[in-house]
Design a protein with these regions (language model features):
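FIC/Doc superfamily catalytic core
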Residues: 1-106
């Protein structure tokens, strides 16, 4: 399993805000690393091997973790899709992705 790093999440967020409106910045620069470390900890110590379970954990952690001043849900979606892509998972286009992302943040 090829995991995603905090730096990759920050880069994804920055790329999103280059293209779309949003307030740049991070209230706590260490939060990205803390959130990703927590996800990696769960994977390691709970023996999680299911890619979709890890993807769900990533999406929820990023969307609810409020790493950034703006764009957390967009970043959560794109980071999760990137994680799945780098692990050779192909997804069909679906309008449900937006709904799932909003639900993950609730």
């Amino acid at each position: 399993m090829r995991l995603i790093t905090a730096q990759e999440i920050i880069q994804i967020h920055d790329d999103i805000l280059e293209r779309l409106a949003g307030v740049k910045g991070m209230p706590d620069p260490g939060r990205a690393e803390a959130i990703i470390s927590r996800v990696h900890h769960h994977i390691l110590y709970e023996g999680i091997t299911d890619l979709f379970e890890v993807a769900a954990m990533l999406m929820i952690a990023i969307a609810k973790g409020h790493i950034f001043n703006d764009g957390n849900k967009r970043t959560a979606l794109m980071a999760t899709l990137y994680f799945l892509f780098r692990n050779d998972v192909k997804l069909k286009k679906s309008n449900q992705l937006e709904d799932w992302t909003v639900e993950a943040a609730i």
